[in-house]
């Protein structure tokens, strides 16, 4: 707790420090939303001029600014003026504004409901996607994250805008060697080589084929919900050749006996029981020599602050970051066994290869 006291030296106790931190988070959110930081000149701006520029009542602006000046988020070059320290200037950048707003709205709006959520649902991690802290915080306690976004277009737009800037994106290629798939390309021309399950608009399958061009695109299948599949860019030469199937991974797998079932950044979003449903649907479609490849962030046994925070972020939506033991549990419950794990050297990304257990 010493870190919170060093952040706010006048805090009498850690509790006071956490209170000051909450105040700072909320005031910064208001400043970001109303572009107050953007209106502050490099050499400082008077509170009166800033109120005129932003349309905020001067009394409110002064009260909010007083705290940010006291906490060193803002500076005061002279009485009645506000300045921007170098580190705060990042809030003039679109990327930082989008990300901060997203994590504040999605995380804090959910986290304040944790006590109520756990009181109602028991002291356990979310068991169902339609029983999540996010849904409770948004006013829809029986809806999943994606259901809530469907009902709240503004939040969906903010979410999509933040995701579009690629914060913390994980690599697709360079982790797992797909060259072995090439050897099977000519043995059975009718066999599907790779099924990209829940593959969105085809970013991953395209990257895999570009990395290993000897894999014929026509022997690959892109699967996602019909409304996602219809937006796949047909002008792309590779994706034009890939077969498209509109389906849900919660339904029976329609492509049977494929060599590889590839699923990237999907299981991360769902609780264990629903992941088992997804994997069992794949297992039921597997041939004896099929392989399942799961591309996800792999949680170390002793995660850093950032990784542990990311896991709790996912908990808000009933999702979960998993370590090797957790993936082993999913495998054994779904009729698979882990055969290898390929890890990215520069991140926590990994491709977990599983084989169907033969009865």
Swiss-Prot record:
Pathway: Mycotoxin biosynthesis. Disruption phenotype: Abolishes the production of equisetin and accumulates the intermediate trichosetin. GO terms for molecular function: O-methyltransferase activity. GO terms for biological process: methylation; secondary metabolite biosynthetic process. Its EC number is 2.1.1.-. Keywords: Methyltransferase, S-adenosyl-L-methionine, Transferase. It is an enzyme of class 2 (transferase). PROSITE patterns: SAM_OMT_II (PS51683). It catalyses: trichosetin + S-adenosyl-L-methionine = equisetin + S-adenosyl-L-homocysteine + H(+). InterPro entries: COMT-like, O_MeTrfase_dom, SAM-dependent_MTases_sf, WH-like_DNA-bd_sf, WH_DNA-bd_sf. Belongs to the class I-like SAM-binding methyltransferase superfamily. Cation-independent O-methyltransferase family. PANTHER family: O-METHYLTRANSFERASE (AFU_ORTHOLOGUE AFUA_2G17820)-RELATED, PUTATIVE (AFU_ORTHOLOGUE AFUA_4G14580)-RELATED. This is Methyltransferase eqxD. It comes from Fusarium heterosporum.
């Amino acid at each position: 707790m010493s870190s919170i006291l060093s952040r706010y030296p006048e805090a009498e106790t850690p509790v006071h420090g956490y209170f000051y931190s909450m105040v700072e988070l909320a005031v910064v959110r208001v400043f970001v939303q109303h572009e107050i930081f953007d209106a502050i000149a490099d050499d400082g701006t008077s509170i009166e001029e800033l109120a005129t520029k932003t349309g905020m009542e001067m009394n409110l602006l002064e009260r909010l600014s007083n705290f940010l000046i006291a906490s060193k988020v803002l500076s005061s070059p002279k009485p009645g003026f506000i300045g921007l320290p170098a580190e705060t200037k990042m809030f003039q950048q679109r990327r930082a504004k989008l990300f901060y707003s997203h994590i504040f709205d999605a995380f804090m709006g959910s986290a304040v409901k944790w006590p109520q959520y756990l009181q109602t649902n028991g002291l356990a991690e979310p068991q169902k996607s339609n029983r999540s802290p996010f849904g409770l915080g948004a006013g829809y306690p029986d809806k999943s994250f994606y259901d809530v976004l469907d009902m709240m277009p503004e939040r969906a737009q903010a979410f999509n805008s933040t995701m579009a800037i690629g914060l913390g994106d994980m690599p697709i290629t360079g982790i797992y060697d797909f060259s072995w798939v090439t050897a099977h390309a000519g043995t059975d021309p009718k066999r599907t080589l790779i099924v990209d399950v829940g593959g969105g608009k085809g970013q991953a399958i395209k990257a895999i084929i570009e990395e290993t061009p000897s894999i014929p695109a026509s022997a690959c299948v892109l699967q996602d919900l019909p409304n996602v599949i219809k937006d796949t860019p047909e002008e792309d030469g590779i994706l034009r050749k890939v077969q498209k199937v509109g389906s849900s991974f919660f339904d029976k797998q329609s492509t049977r006996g494929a060599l590889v079932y590839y699923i990237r950044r999907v299981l991360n979003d769902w609780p264990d029981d629903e992941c088992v449903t997804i994997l069992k649907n794949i297992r039921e479609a597997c041939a004896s020599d099929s392989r399942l490849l799961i591309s996800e962030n792999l949680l170390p046994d002793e995660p850093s602050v950032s990784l542990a925070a990311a896991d709790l972020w996912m908990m808000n939506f009933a999702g979960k970051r998993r370590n090797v033991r957790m993936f082993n549990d999913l495998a054994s419950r779904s009729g698979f066994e882990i055969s290898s794990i390929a890890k990215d050297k520069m991140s926590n990304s990994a491709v977990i290869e599983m084989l169907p257990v033969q009865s």
